[in-house]
Amino acid sequence: MPRRGPALGDPTDFSYRINKITKIVDGDTIDVLLDMGFDIKYQSRVRLFGIDTPESRTRNKEEKVRGLISKEYLKQALKKAKKLTIKTHKGSETGKFGRILGEIFADGVNLNLKMCTEGYAVQYYGQNKSLVEAEHMKNKSKLIKKGVLKK
């Protein structure tokens, strides 16, 4: 039996073409129109899987600024892309609020990962809030150094 290598993908993953972004809710949530094939479209809210961005709708002004910066970064990345796809994983297709959980690919680049490496998001898999906040503070410093965020 042939071994499955990383280039062959996981048969439990599903990929869909994003026909249209209808709304960017915040840095880790978007509304999309998915192309399901056979001329079938599906409207849904998507939570970017495995990441967390600062809240853009909060009373904490400093966090809100960082949240809006993350939202704008995502908006620009999506806007520039010629081809957008979403990849979901069997067993974790939806989150606790019924949203699709997915990795967004813009022209083949995983935006979930890119947002983390660039300092606009942190990896999130349900860990302690204080650990997540500590990572957000590291990103804050990173964005200040880049000149994206003022002290």
What residues fall within each predicted segment?
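Small beta-barrel nucleic-acid-binding modules, primarily SNase/OB-fold domains
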Residues: 1-151
